[in-house]
């Protein structure tokens, strides 16, 4: 394997898959079409329900059939999602598009990290994963920041054109996926390369049994999965509901890019700085990151307009630091043959919490008439997780 070429392809795929022109304005776009925050929260819940159902199966598919194939299929589903959303006439169609988007995201999550780690491992350079992941993370956040600038085009693109432009970008992701090579670390992976579907039923049974055994015998991985799920809750919900809060504070939709742009910039800076950190234990790091994250959510939900800018910056900055080190420890603790599956379990735990959290936060906002009320409740939950973190026995 040509490792530099492989990593370049991974970076291109990471960048284009995160260059979403609608993420900074999709709530405002749907609200402008007459959807309530509770309905939008329901659509988001459909996204996470689909993620919950498909997260682990997609990880299993990546481990048994190939990570490169998973990434290519993800881009195809993303294209279908954007086209469906572009021409969605009602809430049912919006929910269908969100389900397709969730399916695309599950095909990426776990798969991209596993492919990157094992690509390095084939060259005996897995100790460089932290640096490689940091570069990928910076590119992803740069793409997110650039995508948020698309809100400036809200008067030009309108609803359908936003999503059709997304579909064109996703086609570039598909091309990048097709240039990747499948990393073969173990004998099982080499055998799979010859015939991915050979003895698939027997391999699936063994894979599920062995993956469950890893979770039983690696308590660190279980603790990391739990911590990741809790601290991740504000990641998207803050971005989502700050959009409508800024609108209620008098902001024009064309300026909604400012908040996610600043948040992405903060995340990029903190990711670069976090590479220089070498925490001996993750417990104090989690407590610090959760305190900063929860405080940022409270600021975004209860503060003035500037709080809607600073709050998401604190959220994304703290999450960038936490996940850079948490994923390094998690990858070190799990085997290559089960890597995508177990990372998918980590992501599934997040979806389990997001299914009730998303519509509940929207409902709190609708009932109270305050767009930031749900965010305040969420911020309190994250702060509580930091303050009540149990001691390791």
Describe the function of each predicted region.
Residues 1-53, 217-261:
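Helix-loop boundary and gating motifs at the non-cytosolic
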Residues 1-4, 181-226:
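Juxtamembrane intracellular "pre-TM" segments in multi-pass secondary transporters
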Residues 4-7, 86-98, 299-312:
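Helix-loop junctions at membrane interfaces in 12-TM secondary transporters
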Residues 15, 81, 92-108, 307-322:
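Hydrophobic core of transmembrane alpha-helices in multi-pass small-molecule transporters
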Residues 44, 240-393:
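C-terminal transmembrane bundle of multi-pass solute transporters/carriers
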Residues 52-89:
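Conserved MFS/SLC helix-loop-helix module at the cytosolic interface between two early adjacent transmembrane helices
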Residues 99-141:
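Cytoplasmic helix-loop-helix junction between adjacent transmembrane helices
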Residues 166-195, 389-393:
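Helix-loop junctions on the cytosolic side of multi-pass membrane transporters
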């Amino acid at each position: 394997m040509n490792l530099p070429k492989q990593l370049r392809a991974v970076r291109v795929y990471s960048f284009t898959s995160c260059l979403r022109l609608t993420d900074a304005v999709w709530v405002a776009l749907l609200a402008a079409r007459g959807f309530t925050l509770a309905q939008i929260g329901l659509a988001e819940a459909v996204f996470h329900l689909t993620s919950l159902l498909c997260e682990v199966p997609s990880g299993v598919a990546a481990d048994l059939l190939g990570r490169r194939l998973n990434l290519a299929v993800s881009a195809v589903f993303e294209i279908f999602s954007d086209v469906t959303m572009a021409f969605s006439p009602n809430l049912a169609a919006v929910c269908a598009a969100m389900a397709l988007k969730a399916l695309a995201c599950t095909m990426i999550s776990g798969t991209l990290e596993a492919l990157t780690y094992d690509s390095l491992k084939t060259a005996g350079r897995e100790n460089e994963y932290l640096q490689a992941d940091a570069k990928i993370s910076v590119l992803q956040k740069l793409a997110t920041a650039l995508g948020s600038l698309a809100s400036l085009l809200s008067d030009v693109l309108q609803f359908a054109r936003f999503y059709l432009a997304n579909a064109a970008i996703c086609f570039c992701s598909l091309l990048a996926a097709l240039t990747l090579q499948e990393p073969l670390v173990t004998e099982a992976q080499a055998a799979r390369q010859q015939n991915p579907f050979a003895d698939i039923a027997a391999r699936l049974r063994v894979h599920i049994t062995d993956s469950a055994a890893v979770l039983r015998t690696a308590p660190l991985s279980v603790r990391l999965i739990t911590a990741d799920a809790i601290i991740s809750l504000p990641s998207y919900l803050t971005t989502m509901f700050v959009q409508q809060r800024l609108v209620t504070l008098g902001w024009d939709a064309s300026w909604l890019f400012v908040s996610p742009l600043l948040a992405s910039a903060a995340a990029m800076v903190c990711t670069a700085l976090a590479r220089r950190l070498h925490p001996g234990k993750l417990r104090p790091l989690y407590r610090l990151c959760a305190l900063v994250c929860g405080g940022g959510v409270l600021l975004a939900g209860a503060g003035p307009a500037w709080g809607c800018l600073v709050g998401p910056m604190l959220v994304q900055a703290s999450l960038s630091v936490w996940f850079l080190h948490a994923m390094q420890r998690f990858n070190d603790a799990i085997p290559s043959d089960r890597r995508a599956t177990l990372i998918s379990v980590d992501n599934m735990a997040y979806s389990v919490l997001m299914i009730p959290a998303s519509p509940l936060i929207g409902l709190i906002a609708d009932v109270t008439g305050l767009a930031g009320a749900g965010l305040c409740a969420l911020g309190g939950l994250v702060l509580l997780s930091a303050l009540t973190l149990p001691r390791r026995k």
